[in-house]
Amino acid sequence: MTRKIIALVLAMVMCLGFTACGAAEENENVLRVAMECAYAPYNWTQTDDSNGAVPISGTNDFAYGYDVMMAKLIAESMGKELEIVKLDWDSLVPAVASGDVDMVIAGQSITSERLEVVDFSDPYFYASIVTLTKADSAYANAAAVADLAGATCTSQLGTIWYDICLPQIPEANILTAQETAPAMLVALESGAVDLVVTDMPTALAATAVYSDMVLLDFTGTDGEFEVSEEEINLGISIQKGNAELLDAVNAVLAELSVEDYEAMMADAIAVQPLSE
């Protein structure tokens, strides 16, 4: 009986081994890239494949935006099929750290905190920090962070905008962080807050949709938000220690210029869905 049980277990292990090998070989031809699919102009969800959108794994929807453009370039250079995985913001780093996905391309700042658990590529976009308010707001003519004093404000959860920038506003009434960038913009549009802090691409996308929003950019002045270079450099996160994949991504980025990044972002903003 014991020999039969051992033989059965060995057979099961061999069977599982062959199955795993087959799955591994199949997965080698697929590049799994995670993003929110709700963060225009970086990434968003749409119902068709227009403009080159890519199917979102496990759904009938498609993803597009700057991050998808970049993911397509990387997958093509590696000769792999691109698979987009839709995750909420807080699940992105754990997913790539555990190896559930190959990389995250989602407008992530290259922060020291994130670098403790994942590796980052060279920057794939440089995103300055700006403020959005309404045209009829008391803050519409602000020329410095100090001019935003006393404002009721919010931003997106888990971002440097909320964690680092909002506390720099004197006597700010900081409300609960919003789960997504669209929710942050709705808070401003509805009048729930006086202003939100975000990055330039998100703000440009917002003003293209909401005609009553005003973009305030204090960058390069004495009254700008105090942030480090790492906090405004956006990178592609990869599982720690995967040097081969990191090198492959950086090789693609090395072929692109800042002007290329800006042109791609402009294209993304031009075709973003109004709902985003």
Model regions: which residues?
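Ligand-binding clefts/hinges and TM-proximal coupling segments of bilobed small-molecule sensing domains
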Residues: 160-179, 215-216, 247-276
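Short, low-complexity disordered leader/linker segments with a strong preference
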Residues: 1-30, 276
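Extracytoplasmic small-molecule ligand-binding "clamshell" domains
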Residues: 27-108, 177
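Periplasmic-binding protein-like
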Residues: 38, 126-133, 209-253, 271-276
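A ligand-binding cleft/hinge motif common to bilobed small-molecule-binding domains
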Residues: 91, 97, 107-117, 163-167, ...
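Short amphipathic alpha-helical coupling segments at ligand-binding clamshell hinges
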Residues: 70, 144-147, 199, 240-255, ...
